[in-house]
């Protein structure tokens, strides 16, 4: 949409910086609030941020704001997700199990990138891909609610 390259580069930089902050914050909050609720909040908020990107006029302020917000939400799912895996299955095989989670995530990232490219080729716009991202984020927010988290035990902290 005619974005200046310096704004795009700045936005990408801000995503990385805010990724670190979001991950630290979600890790801390996940120790206080049930991890499934933290994940649901992150995914729901992500859907709102993407919706706002689609509906607000595209300008430098919106792009910079979006970059900061999506950065906060992007990798912030990692601490609560690894916490849920540890809670459900213990820490003995946490590295292997979380490795499987991450490989699955990367496969999803490949599919998402590929589909995004197809959407541009077919429709000449990424709007449909953003709409799909909103739907997937809302779905993700919903499916985390039924997760049963065990009460904290010594094994989880090992």
What are these regions (language model features)?
Residues 131-158:
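Multi-pass alpha-helical transporter architecture, strongest
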Residues 5-6, 91-101:
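Loop-to-transmembrane helix entry/capping segments in MFS-fold secondary transporters
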């Amino acid at each position: 949409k005619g974005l200046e390259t310096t704004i795009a580069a700045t936005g990408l930089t801000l995503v990385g910086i805010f990724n670190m902050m979001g991950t630290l914050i979600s890790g801390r909050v996940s120790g206080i609030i049930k991890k499934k609720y933290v994940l649901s909040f992150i995914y729901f908020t992500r859907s709102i941020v993407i919706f706002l990107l689609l509906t607000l006029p595209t300008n430098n302020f919106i792009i910079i704001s979006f970059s900061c917000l999506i950065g906060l939400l992007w990798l912030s799912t990692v601490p609560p997700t690894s916490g849920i895996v540890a809670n459900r299955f213990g820490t003995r095989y946490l590295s292997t199990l979380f490795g499987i989670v991450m490989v699955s995530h990367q496969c999803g990232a490949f599919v998402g990138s590929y589909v995004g490219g197809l959407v541009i080729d077919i429709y000449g716009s990424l709007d449909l891909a953003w709409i799909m991202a909103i739907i997937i984020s809302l779905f993700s927010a919903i499916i985390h609610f039924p997760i049963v988290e065990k009460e904290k035990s010594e094994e989880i902290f090992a």
